[in-house]
């Protein structure tokens, strides 16, 4: 039986659905690797050198298409265990997400392919103002994985993380 994280609850009327995000930190006792994501639709673009990423065993950058068919970028960092992901990876994760994210060389804790953790911020009328902004506004720690997810804000990013992990759970239950 699949433990699907994409849950919906009825709101004020039967036609309204409310998104319920997954827990930010969860451990099902599994040890994941990049091979577990082959059937999810995730396409690996780069494998990062993790020599300077304390405790990480591997890290990857890639994309998955959303429900509209548009590619969205994700970063996956793997650790030996869930405890390592939490205890060694959290400070690196917090450093690059959200409103206080550090996406410049002078303050980022891990510089490997830093440019892939940024995007140009949009201005009025969908014009680009050329200001660098963090690509990932949230992350989840799922078993031994830290998953960084794109989004316009923390809630949008968490929804993308939940959908991503839900696809993993669905593919592993088949």
Language-model segments: residues:
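Extracytoplasmic/periplasmic, Sec-exported soluble proteins
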Residues: 25, 29, 77-80, 153-156
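N-terminal "mature-domain start" segment
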Residues: 13-66, 158-174
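Short, solvent-exposed recognition patches
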Residues: 34-132
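A short, solvent-exposed beta-edge/loop patch
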Residues: 20, 109-174
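Sec-dependent bacterial lipoprotein signal peptides
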Residues: 1-10
């Amino acid at each position: 039986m699949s433990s699907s994280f994409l849950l919906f609850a009825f709101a004020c009327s039967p036609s309204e659905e409310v998104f319920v995000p997954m827990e930010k930190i969860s451990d099902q006792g599994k040890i994941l690797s990049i091979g577990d994501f082959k059937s999810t639709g995730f396409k690996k673009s780069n494998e990062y050198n993790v020599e300077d990423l304390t405790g990480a065993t591997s890290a990857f950058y890639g994309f998955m298409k959303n429900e509209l068919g548009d590619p969205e970028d994700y970063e996956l960092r793997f650790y030996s265990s869930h405890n390592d992901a939490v205890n060694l990876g959290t400070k690196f994760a917090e450093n690059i997400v959200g409103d206080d994210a550090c996406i410049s060389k002078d303050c980022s804790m891990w510089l490997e392919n830093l440019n892939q953790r940024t995007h140009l911020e949009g201005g009025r009328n969908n014009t680009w103002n050329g200001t660098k902004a963090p690509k990932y506004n949230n992350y989840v720690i799922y078993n031994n994985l830290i998953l960084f997810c794109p989004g316009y804000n923390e809630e949008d990013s968490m929804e993308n993380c939940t959908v991503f992990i839900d696809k993993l759970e669905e593919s592993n239950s088949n």
